[in-house]
């Protein structure tokens, strides 16, 4: 159990006693205290600040003067005590009792049980073999590891051989209590904690619902894990929905026409005409609730448009999950929908580790389908959990599970909602800083709202009004096509910036450009790590961890980068690591010279158009056989590795994609298209001509030829 401190005003120290550590009221942020003791004269100075935290820390007031405490503060005060010296012990016991109750209330079920278990100091003869870190401490290398992480991470890495904490696979005890609490917080019927990322969460959900022959309505933006789970593992038949890319390289949403019933029926007629007249032809639709680049869907709109055609809808919310805790985003949350027996069942997967409070790999699945219980299409817990156990380890890492538990506690509190509101405001202030102090790099938001500059509005107004983030189809700033009004908005918690090279008026290439990968490398050289970049776009994730000083540091570095661009600094000073590793290639180069060559490569290959065409129906690769069957051919080695120069028209054995974002450009079983071929050859050319900026590519293999050139290869099926 934790032992939080008592915060106090120096004026009252003599009027209570405690074995706990004390901290002066002026020196705490209130996250480390279990009770607060103030003098009556301090009430006006501190009580509003304490109340604003929304932590509900019990506050004791010592009446140190004749002035009575104003009754308007009563709803924020736990106890008021006098100066009676005979009752100091009584008052001290009251303070300690309140502190203990606060600590009990603050600890969620699984983490509470885990911390109590560690305190028991059991003697371990079970897994894991390091047994509380004792093994590590017997070797110098192990001791380094032990000292680096600290004792508790090892003590809490325990085995399910002791049933005290409950079973994580069949959901018993404290583990079950934690998931029930999370379901309550997120407004789900059931919640499943997953310890191998949302890649596994998606596969669990998809394997629970889909089988060979099922039709799955498939967002072409879906992460590769959805292809793996729905198509390669489950063997379902996809009907793809085309999606948008803009010239900057941002990932957009599904075209509005794709949600029209007549259009969907035309696709069914092409792919599975035998299902055309079924009431619900789609066993499942898989939709990205929010894209990697912060295009957010309206879940109510999606369900109203296509819900009657689907047994279930899976909203892959890997890149969101916090929307219901930000009031202006609530309408986009599928978990807050009012549903009836005619609606689809709802599944939501969330990467808690991305922008919520979880260790890496923590994820969760929310199941909201009791409104269809009793219908044949309903997947009950036992069947769903069978899929869960297919993908879950029998040796779970309990600290991961504990962070999921604590995350729910944070999000379920008023304090958690306050933190998200502050996060949104910090992001708004950062955008204003860029708009007011940078000239080349621009935030990806509307230029004006009702004729007034975006940055001239009050931050609080922007933080509570979605109008400041909406994609209106007639607006030109975003350059997305195919959207309907009120369909999408920019996630305020994705700090999106564009770099020079694309005309803001036409969306066409300009004469000079600054590819975002150059800015990303510059920032990494200076200790700032962006989430990702692509073409002329760069993304930074915003969470309640952010502070305005952190954002000021980022903007200051961006402004310094712009200065280097304007004065055309030598590359060796701007990107010293890239220069050092490739000095023969870049000797004597300036930063603008590098920018120009990379920009010219994009222009010559028209990469922005290639990237857009990869996800448009007219230029999607031709579907030849089910991805499951293509994968079987790969396993049986009925494949050959061919250079990309010879790959057009051949059937892919593997999915091909750049990572990030992890969205397949070619799916197993599809013919390699001219568009995909040209796109990956453009990446190959960049790797060869501009060393130091190679992207990560999966499903395409880069090999050095005898002439020293790096060439791209891909596996294709031999019998097709």
Swiss-Prot record:
GO terms for molecular function: carboxy-lyase activity; ornithine decarboxylase activity; pyridoxal phosphate binding. It holds the Pfam family OKR_DC_1_N. InterPro entries: CheY-like_superfamily, ODC_inducible, OKR_de-COase_N, Orn/lys/arg_de-COase, Orn/Lys/Arg_deCO2ase_major_dom, Ornithine_deCO2ase_N, Prn/Lys/Arg_de-COase_C, Prn/Lys/Arg_de-COase_C_sf. The modification N6-(pyridoxal phosphate)lysine is found at residue 354. Keywords: Decarboxylase, Lyase, Pyridoxal phosphate. Its EC number is 4.1.1.17. Disulfide bonds: none annotated. Its cofactor is pyridoxal 5'-phosphate. The keyword Cell inner membrane does not apply. GO terms for biological process: amino acid metabolic process. GO terms for cellular component: cytosol. It comes from the Bacteria. SUPFAM superfamilies: CheY-like, Ornithine decarboxylase C-terminal domain, PLP-dependent transferases. It catalyses: L-ornithine + H(+) = putrescine + CO2. Belongs to the Orn/Lys/Arg decarboxylase class-I family. PANTHER family: BIODEGRADATIVE ARGININE DECARBOXYLASE (PTHR45229:SF3), CONSTITUTIVE ORNITHINE DECARBOXYLASE (PTHR45229). This is Ornithine decarboxylase. It comes from Haemophilus influenzae (strain ATCC 51907 / DSM 11121 / KW20 / Rd).
């Amino acid at each position: 159990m934790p032992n939080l401190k008592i915060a106090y005003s120096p004026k009252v120290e003599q009027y209570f006693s405690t074995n706990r550590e004390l901290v002066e009221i002026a020196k705490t942020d209130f996250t480390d205290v279990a009770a607060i003791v103030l003098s009556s004269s301090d009430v006006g100075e501190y009580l509003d600040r304490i109340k604003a935290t929304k932590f509900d820390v019990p506050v004791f007031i010592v009446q140190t003067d004749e002035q009575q405490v104003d009754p308007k503060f009563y709803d924020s005060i736990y106890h008021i005590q006098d100066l009676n010296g005979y009752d100091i012990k009584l008052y001290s016991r009251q303070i300690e009792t309140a502190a203990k109750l606060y600590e009990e209330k603050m600890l969620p079920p699984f983490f509470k049980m885990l911390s109590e278990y560690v305190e028991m100091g059991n003697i371990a003869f079970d897994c894991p073999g390091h047994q509380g870190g004792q093994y590590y401490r017997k070797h110098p290398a192990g001791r380094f590891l032990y000292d680096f992480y600290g004792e508790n991470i090892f003590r809490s890495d325990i085995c399910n051989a002791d049933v005290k904490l409950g079973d994580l696979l069949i959901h018993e005890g404290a583990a079950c209590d934690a998931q029930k609490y999370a379901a309550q917080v997120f407004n789900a019927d059931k919640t499943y904690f997953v310890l191998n990322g949302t890649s596994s969460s998606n596969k669990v959900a998809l394997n629970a619902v889909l089988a060979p022959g099922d039709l799955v309505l498939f967002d072409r933006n879906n992460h590769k894990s959805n292809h793996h789970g729905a198509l390669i593992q489950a063997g379902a038949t996809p009907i793809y929905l085309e999606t948008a890319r803009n010239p900057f390289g941002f990932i957009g949403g599904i075209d509005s026409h794709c949600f029209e019933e007549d259009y969907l029926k035309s696709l069914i007629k092409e792919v599975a005409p035998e299902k055309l007249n079924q009431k619900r032809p789609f066993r499942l639709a898989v939709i990205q609730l929010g894209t990697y680049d912060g295009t957010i869907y309206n879940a109510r709109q999606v369900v109203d448009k296509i819900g009657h055609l689907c047994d279930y809808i899976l909203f892959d919310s890997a890149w969101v999950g916090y929307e219901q805790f930000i009031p202006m985003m609530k309408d986009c949350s599928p978990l807050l929908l009012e549903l009836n027996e005619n609606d689809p069942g709802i599944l939501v997967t969330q990467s808690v580790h991305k922008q919520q409070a979880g260790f890496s790999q923590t994820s969760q699945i929310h199941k909201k389908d009791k409104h269809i219980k009793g219908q044949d299409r309903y997947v009950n817990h036992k069947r769903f959990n069978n899929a869960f156990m297919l993908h879950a380890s029998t040796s779970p890492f309990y600290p991961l599970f504990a962070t999921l538990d604590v995350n729910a506690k944070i999000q379920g509190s008023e304090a958690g909602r306050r933190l998200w509101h502050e996060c949104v405001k910090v992001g708004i202030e950062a955008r204003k800083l860029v708009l007011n102090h940078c000239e080349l790099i621009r935030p990806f938001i509307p230029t004006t709202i009702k004729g007034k500059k975006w940055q001239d509005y009050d931050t609080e107004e922007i933080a509570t009004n979605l109008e400041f983030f909406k994609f209106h189809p007639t607006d030109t700033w975003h350059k997305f096509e195919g959207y309907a009004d009120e369909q999408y908005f920019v996630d305020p918690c994705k700090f999106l910036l564009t770099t020079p090279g694309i005309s803001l008026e036409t969306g066409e290439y300009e004469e000079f450009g600054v590819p975002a990968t150059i800015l990303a490398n510059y920032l990494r050289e200076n200790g700032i790590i962006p989430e990702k970049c692509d073409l002329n776009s760069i993304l930074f994730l915003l969470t309640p961890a952010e502070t305005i000083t952190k954002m000021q540091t980022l903007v200051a570095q961006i402004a310094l980068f712009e200065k280097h661009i304007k004065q055309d600094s030598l590359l060796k000073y701007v990107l010293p690591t890239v220069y050092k590793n490739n000095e023969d290639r870049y000797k004597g180069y300036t930063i603008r010279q590098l920018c120009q060559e990379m920009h010219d490569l994009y222009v010559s290959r028209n990469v922005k158009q290639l990237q857009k065409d990869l996800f448009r129906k007219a230029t999607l690769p031709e579907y030849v056989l089910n991805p499951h069957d293509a994968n079987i051919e790969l396993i049986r080695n009925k494949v050959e590795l061919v250079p990309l120069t010879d790959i057009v028209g051949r059937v892919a054995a593997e999915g091909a994609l750049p990572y990030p974002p992890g969205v397949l450009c070619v799916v197993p079983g599809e013919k390699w298209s001219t568009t995909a071929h040209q796109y990956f050859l453009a990446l190959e050319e960049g790797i060869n001509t501009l060393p130091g900026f190679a992207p990560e590519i999966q499903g395409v293999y880069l090999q050095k030829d005898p002439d020293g050139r790096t060439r791209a290869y891909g596996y294709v099926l031999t019998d097709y």
